[in-house]
Amino acid sequence: MAIAPRGPGRTPEARVEWALKFRLLDLSKLSERARHRAWAMLVAWERGRPAEGPRPARDKVPEAQQALRQVIEALANGLPDVVWMPETTWSIWPARRRRPGARRGGRVTMTTDHTSPGGIPVTPEAIVVAFVNDLNAVEADRLRACPLKTNGTTCGAIFLAARRQIYCTARHAQAAAWLRYQPKRKEKRP
């Protein structure tokens, strides 16, 4: 997956889908530009506004990816996950007033005490909190792991279900239906 130039998306569902793809990304194969873009997207998702300044040498993108991977896999399999949040001071700024005739007003802005000139590292724990907030906004029970078992192994692909979707793809749903049908068919044979 290449890092999308526009970012994780504007809607919570788009950001959750982006996180599902980002957790599988091989960061060692990214170019410097793509790595910077990944850092900028994670900072924007974490803080609710675009990143300013240069990317630090230790950007914590791999740690954020690992934290996302752990929470996604735990929640999709129905398990709890623990996230330790380091002490950080957050400043919360009120939204700007709506201009006359504008449809939308400003957003509440949150800033942290990471104001070093070398750039802002990503806080993996805050990324997990942002992911969970977006997941709750799109109905958290939609995050699932595919239960199809073939030859004793479970598929386990993690996906965001649409409506009553149980399996990750239509092909897996057909395979599961066929597996349920086969024993009945064998019993009817004389």
Which residue ranges define each predicted feature?
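Short helix-coil boundary/hinge micro-motifs
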Residues: M1-L160, R189-P190
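Short metal-binding segments enriched for Cys and/or His
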Residues: Q174-K188
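Cysteine-rich micro-motifs
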Residues: A161-A176
